Amino acid sequence: MEKGYMISDASKMLEVENHVLRYWEEELELPIPRNELGHRFYRDSEIKLLRTVKDLKEQGFQLKAIKKLLPDLERVENMDPQMLYQLREELNGEVLREAMEHARGDRKSVV
């Protein structure tokens, strides 16, 4: 079997709590593999991906914005800081607009 890490090991490597990794997995719909006992099994590729997610979160990206970036994550990792800032502002604004539209739609259905 390929070398991997349990969630407790992965959380220590990434310096986040276990529940944060589970939350990111759920919200970003990440296909984290499981071992034969059904426990999460983080390979180096998942650790690298989650490290990038953590870095983007620390730079102010919302999870919904990060989710939109997942297909192009490798390109995003190599962006210069100014372009990354512009992308963050654009995507976070888009996420906010979508949330506001959703909230307005919910209010209309109640009235």
Predicted region positions:
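Basic helix-turn-helix/winged-helix DNA-binding cores
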Residues: 1-71
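Charged, helix-prone or intrinsically disordered regulatory segments positioned adjacent to compact structured domains
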Residues: 45-48, 52-104
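Conserved small/polar residues in nucleotide/adenosyl-binding loops
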Residues: 108-111
